[in-house]
Amino acid sequence: MVKMVIVVRSDIKMGKGKMAAQVAHAAVTLVISIINSNNSRWKEWLNEWLQQGQPKIVVKANSLDEIILRSKKAETMNLPFSIIEDAGKTQLEPGTITCLGIGPAPENLIDPITGDLKLL
């Protein structure tokens, strides 16, 4: 199965609507970056993901360090990823990193990076 995983920071205070918007930013950013990339493997994964109903899993990380560590692992494995920074117009300071999106990619590649995290 091909899936997308969004990792949300649980150490910062965000309302439910704010958190939902940040998760949406991560998902949309990932899809746009794949469409605009020249990576044929990523595009194959995107097409499979779309055909499979766009499975998304949202999990939580306890710190910014966890987000950075997992983004580096995704980068090392050449997986699509996006780090979302808040614009700072409502609840958070500008530039606050709120979440990390990884995928769409095969679950056997994503699970070693995010499989230990708890569902949000």
UniProtKB/Swiss-Prot annotation:
Q: What is its EC number?
A: 3.1.1.29
As for subcellular location, the record says: Cytoplasm
Q: Which Gene3D superfamilies match?
A: Bit1
Give the enzyme's main class according to its UniProt record, as a single word: hydrolase
The record's catalysed reaction(s) read: an N-acyl-L-alpha-aminoacyl-tRNA + H2O = an N-acyl-L-amino acid + a tRNA + H(+)
The record's InterPro entries line, in alphabetical order, gives:
Pep_tRNA_hydro_II_dom_sf (IPR023476), Pept_tRNA_hydro_arch (IPR034759), PTH2 (IPR002833)
GO biological process annotations for this chain's record?
Answer: translation
Lineage: superkingdom: Archaea
Would you identify the family this protein belongs to, as annotated? Answer: Belongs to the PTH2 family.
Q: What does this protein do?
A: The natural substrate for this enzyme may be peptidyl-tRNAs which drop off the ribosome during protein synthesis.
What name does this protein carry? Peptidyl-tRNA hydrolase
Q: Which gene encodes it?
A: pth
